[in-house]
């Protein structure tokens, strides 16, 4: 227990290598400590040691099969490794254990979208939002899926909901700009891209999108500056 606490303390101050050592010492004393395997997995994930993170989450789940957050994190790590079908199974397991797990529904939606299963992704995002209506990321992700389905007006509403919850959400401003651009509302799209850049000045995609919109409006000098 002491080594687990010291590991958490090291993690809090950003000493991740020391964190790993403390958790491993805890597991040497008590190998069936599911929470420490989970904590070790989170640390490996932060260190981008994804294969090690997967092993730690799997060990946690072997000890505690109903560990919903470990299922969710395992899914997220598998997704990062490109193992999308396995990630889907992990998220579904997390949801089976904890049906009101909004993050797991959202993450499942992200993975289904990557697999090209847009209708299923929409349903997952909608379930996340039914549980957590003020979930800005969920509204943004639902907007992206609807955008890809060509449902632009519905996508606009989703991005606007995300921004009503989190006005500093640069990605949602950019995505709203894209939807408005496709609806040929170029002046409004420009404002969205500009807001995204104000929030996140190094947002390359927003600069590029702003340049394209300004070019379409015939503002060539301003367009060139955006591309620069």
Regions found by a protein language model. Give the residues of each.
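Conserved alpha-helical positions within TPR/SEL1-like repeat arrays
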Residues: 1-12, 35-46, 69-80, 103-114, ...
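Short, intrinsically disordered, charge-balanced linker/junction segments flanking boundaries
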Residues: 219, 223-228
């Amino acid at each position: 227990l002491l080594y687990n606490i010291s590991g958490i303390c090291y993690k809090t101050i950003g000493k991740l290598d020391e964190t790993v050592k403390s958790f491993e010492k805890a597991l040497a004393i008590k190998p069936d400590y599911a929470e420490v395997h989970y904590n070790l997995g989170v640390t490996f994930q932060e260190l981008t040691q994804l294969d090690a993170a997967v092993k730690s989450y799997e060990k946690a789940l072997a000890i505690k099969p109903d560990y919903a957050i470990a299922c969710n994190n395992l899914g997220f790590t598998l997704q990062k490794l490109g193992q999308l079908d396995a990630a889907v199974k992990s998220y579904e397991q997390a949801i089976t254990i904890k049906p009101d797990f909004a993050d797991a529904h959202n993450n499942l939606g992200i993975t289904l979208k990557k697999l090209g299963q847009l209708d299923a992704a929409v349903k997952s995002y909608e379930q996340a939002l039914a549980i957590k209506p003020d979930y800005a990321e969920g509204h943004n992700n639902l907007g992206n899926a609807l955008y890809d389905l060509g449902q632009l007006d519905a996508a606009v509403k989703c991005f606007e909901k995300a921004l009503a919850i989190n006005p500093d959400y640069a990605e949602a401003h950019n995505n709203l700009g894209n939807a408005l651009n496709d609806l040929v509302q170029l002046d409004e799209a420009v404002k969205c891209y500009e807001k995204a850049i104000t929030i996140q000045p190094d947002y390359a995609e927003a600069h590029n999108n702003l340049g394209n919109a300004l070019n379409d409006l015939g503002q060539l000098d301003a367009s060139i500056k955006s591309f620069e």
